[in-house]
A protein has these predicted regions:
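Core catalytic lobe of class I
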Residues: 1-175
C-alpha cells in the first residue's frame, strides 16, 4: 500500500500488514488499558494475564517499528494502570506503570525516547481519596493524568524540498 500525505487508521495489527516497510512518518496510539477496562470485542488485554498483554503489545510495537521510516516517531499515550486489590497480589489496590515494559521493548529495538508530555485530567477527575471517614488509613491516589511518550526510530532526517516547506508554512494567525 503506497501512502503519501494521508491519515490512516487501523483498529488491528492484521490490517497494518498492508503497509510497506518504512512508509509511515508518525504513529499516534493509545493501547487498551489491559484488563482494567472492557472496550468490547476482541481487545488486547481483556482476559489476558499482564505478561500476555505485554506480549500482545510488543507484537503491535514490532509492526509499528517495521512501518516507521528512519527518524519516524511513535507517540504512545498511556496512563498508570490501577490494579484492583483482588488481582494485585498485595491485598490492596496498586498502580502498575506499563511504560516500564514498553520502554524496555523500545530500547531493545533501538528506538530512543525523544520527549514526554503529561496530560493533566485533574479538572475532570477527583485527585485523592483519603480512605473511609472518619479513619482515613490509606491515601489512594487517582490516576488523574496520562503520559504521552514519543519514541524515535534511529535514522537520518528525511530531506524535504524547500519549495514544499515554504508552501506549508503556517501564518502567524494559524499558529
Amino acid at each position: 500500500m503506497k501512502v503519501e500525505n494521508q491519515t490512516i487508521h487501523f483498529k488491528s495489527l492484521e490490517n497494518m500488514k498492508e503497509l510497506s516497510d518504512e512508509s509511515i512518518e508518525l504513529i499516534v496510539t493509545s493501547p487498551p488499558y489491559w484488563d482494567v477496562k472492557d472496550y468490547g470485542g476482541d481487545q488486547i488485554g481483556f482476559g489476558q494475564s499482564y505478561n500476555e498483554y505485554i506480549s500482545s503489545l510488543n507484537r503491535i510495537w514490532s509492526e509499528c517499528i517495521r512501518v516507521l521510516r528512519p527518524n519516524g516517531k511513535i507517540a504512545i499515550n498511556v496512563q498508570p494502570l490501577p490494579i484492583p486489590s483482588d488481582r494485585s497480589g498485595f491485598n490492596r489496590r496498586i498502580i502498575k506503570n506499563i511504560m516500564v515494559d514498553i520502554e524496555r521493548f523500545m530500547w531493545k529495538k533501538d528506538l530512543y525516547l525523544s520527549c514526554m508530555f503529561y496530560w493533566d485530567k485533574s479538572a475532570y477527575i477527583s485527585n485523592v481519596s483519603w480512605g473511609s471517614y472518619p479513619n482515613p488509613t490509606n491515601i489512594a491516589s487517582n490516576t488523574s493524568f496520562e503520559q504521552i511518550f514519543v519514541w524515535v526510530k534511529r535514522g537520518s532526517t528525511r530531506s524535504i524540498p524547500k519549495d514544499l516547506l515554504k508552501k506549508n508554512l503556517l501564518r502567524k494567525e494559524e499558529w
